[in-house]
């Protein structure tokens, strides 16, 4: 993805060169690398419109995919701004920790500012969900109530539980689907259903997988 920003690609053929297939049919990625750490500096030094580099690039391949997910590090920088400009919906994972709530507030403030400053009505904050959750602990229950009080109806009911299999597959560079039964997979599937962003056919297919 660093090449996308560095060379400010605008053509579909240029973007397609960055796309890699995965072991999962129908799932492609544009991976990052250590070089991506220089992207913020390179964008800052450029005098062009740095806010829409990602949006302009993804527009060329938008019709090739049902969904495009943008995964951002928790930072308020030009990369996050690019993702906000390029998005229709924004979903934020949070942990039941005080600094996570502070970071979420900063993210929401950025979204509101960008929407108002640039008149971007299409962007919607869909909600936040709790990740790495130990659902039987008092810390989780207290933290969930704290987020509920601050987010009202913007906190999804489905938490994603802690799952040691995530670390295991990360070490072997495998998909989580290769690990067999996984709490995280089940939770993310239920979370997708709660978000109501799937097509009717996709929703029925996912429900069928959960019932197996």
Regions found by a protein language model. Name each.
Residues 1-212:
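P-loop NTP-binding core
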